[in-house]
């Protein structure tokens, strides 16, 4: 059977603005850093893959000296790991509070896919505990148990590297032309395309202006009939999903995509995770 594979952050819920950003800022305050990322600054940091890597991007020699931080590699590695543990704890508490409900259409299309026998998965290099918490709030604990979850340090390279999607389809045992990825960012799209998957993009708060060339469908959200409707922003396969993207639309997408030439991700769309691969093999946002 086909597979429906979701990214987590920005796809299952609007976690960036209402979860990750305040968790980063709470951590900076807790460790005594004179830093508070604005929406605009965080949008720029999101072009860097990985939470510790985003924190590491602050560590210029001037910033390190001004804030009396470790200047050696090992000291910085341990410091970033500690900051990230605090940030993950703050974020997980926010998710548990229910402050981030699932995005429109997520619970609905998951039920449609489950009823049709599709395999369900999440492929995210965010911390597994964070992914599981968001997933359970988005679709319910009972349905979340039906998902295969590929997260955290299960792969060492972060998106736009396709490793997480390659692992997911291999473990699921599904042909790559029978899997649909749902992403919200150019980095995620490039990862899915690099693995040979068709990709639906549901734009989110910080990604609306990114380049989604190669996406099979770009929408404002998956949409809910009678609720928050979907708006098609790019529809190269002429799916015409209407107010909601339904499973039948994804089935037609797979049929049409398999008959089309392979789509390759455009180079240079966003910053790769090469930014700081030595800092960690354990992720997250």
Where are these regions (language model features)?
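A general structural motif
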Residues: 1, 117, 176-178
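N-terminal-biased segments
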Residues: 59-66, 119-125, 135-138, 147
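Substrate-recognition element of Asp-dependent hydrolases with the DxDx(T/V) motif
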Residues: 24, 101, 106-136, 192
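N-terminal helical cap/lid subdomain that shapes the substrate entry/recognition surface
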Residues: 1-8, 12-104, 115
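Conserved SAM-binding loop
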Residues: 13, 120-123, 181-182
